[in-house]
Amino acid sequence: MILRTHYSGQISADMDGKEVMLAGFAHEIRDLGGIAFLVLRDREGMAQITLVKKLLGKDVFKMARSISRESVVMVRGNVKAEAKAPRGYEILPTEIQVLSAAQVPLPLDPTEKVECELDTRLDSRFMDIRRPCVLAAFEIESAVLCSLRDYFHKKGIVEVFTPKIVAAATEGGTDLFPISYFEKEAFLNQSPQLYKQMLMGAGMDRVYEIGPIFRAEEHDTRRHLNEAISIDLEVSFADDKDVMEILEEAVAGAYSYVADNCRRQLEVLNMELEVPRLPFKRITYTRALELAEEKAGARMQWGDDLDTETERFLGESIGEHYFLIDWPSSIKPYYTLPYEDKPEICRGFDLMHPRMELEIERASCRERV
C-alpha cells in the first residue's frame, strides 16, 4: 500500500488541483475553531494541511485537531495554490491517518522553540535527529560523500573496504581500542594505511576508502574523535604534485556539489557556502614560520611542529584553503620521502582549512624500499 506519492519539497503551486499523498510528522497544529492548520514535516521540509470542518465532517475534523505533535501521519488531499501559505500552496485533505500517535509530553521540542541540554538530546537521540538542523547536517554529509565517490570514479580510483579488526597497530600502539576476538586480543583499526600500501604492491595503482576509524585518545577537543569517518587515498606512479591536484579538485568539487544540491539544507543551517578557488595556494613550512614571525610575532625554531595558534593565524592571513608543503623530515613519519638534494626536507604536505585550525588531509610521497 502506497502511503506517500510526494515529499513536501516536490510539491509546488503549479500542481494546483492534483491529488497527492504525504507522510511525515505532525510538526505543529493551530486550531482556530472551524478551521485548523496541521503542519506536516518530512525530510524535505514542511507542508501546510488546511483542515476545514465543513469539508472534512465533524468526526474527522475532531480527530485531526486532536493529533499530538510528532505523531506519524499520512495525508491524502488536493493541492491548492495559496500565496499566503508558507510554500505557496496548501493541501486540502480528503483523508487523514494517524500511523503512530506520539506520547505526551515530548522529551524535547523538535521545533527548536525550546532549547534543551545535551544529555536530553542524547537520551532521546531519535527525536533530536528529527530537528531540521540536525537532519540537514546528515544530508550534507551524504552529498559530500556522493560528490567524492563520483570524482574518484571518474579518475579511475577504485573504492576498497579494508578490515576494521586488526592484530596490531598501524600508526603506533598507544591509541588503539582493544577487543576480545575469540579469546585473543585484537584491536579496532585506527587507519587503513597498511592495507592501502599492500594494494599498491598488488598493482591496484589507485584506491580509496571511505569508512570508520577508531582512536582511543582524549576527545575533549575539536581535533580528536574516538570514532570518525575517514577518507583515505593511495596512488601509485605519481608524485606529491599529482596528489595535491587530485585533492584540491575533489575538495572544491564537493563544495560546489553541496552549494548546488543542498540549498535548502544550507538555508536551514543559515550558512552561505563559498566554493574555494583553484588551484589552492602552496605555502612552504619555512614561509609559514616567516609569516608567523612577521605578522604575529611568533618565534618558532625551524623543525618545530606548528601549534594551534600558528595554524589559526595562517588560516586568517591566507584566507583560503592552502597546502602546507616541504616539511622538515624530522617531524613527519619515517616513511615520508625526502628530497634527494635536501634530505632535511621531505615531500609531505597538509591540506589546511582557513578557519578550522586543522588539516583536512595529511599526505606524503612514500619512501622507496
Range-by-range predicted roles:
Residues G253-E267:
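Flexible helix-coil linker/hinge segments at domain or subdomain boundaries
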Residues F138-S142, C146, F237, K241, ...:
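Short amphipathic alpha-helical segments with heptad-repeat character
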Residues V160, A259-R263, R299-W302:
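Acidic/polar loop patches that form or flank catalytic/metal-binding clefts of enzymes
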Residues V369:
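Cysteine-cluster motifs in flexible loop/terminal segments that predominantly coordinate metals
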Residues F161, L266-V268, L324:
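Cytochrome P450 heme-thiolate monooxygenase catalytic core
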Residues I2-S236:
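Class II aminoacyl-tRNA synthetase-like tRNA-binding/catalytic domains
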Residues D175-D242, I246-G253, L278-R366:
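A translation/RNA-centric and nucleic-acid-associated enzymatic feature enriched
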Residues Q265-L278:
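Short, highly charged C-terminal tails/helix-capping segments
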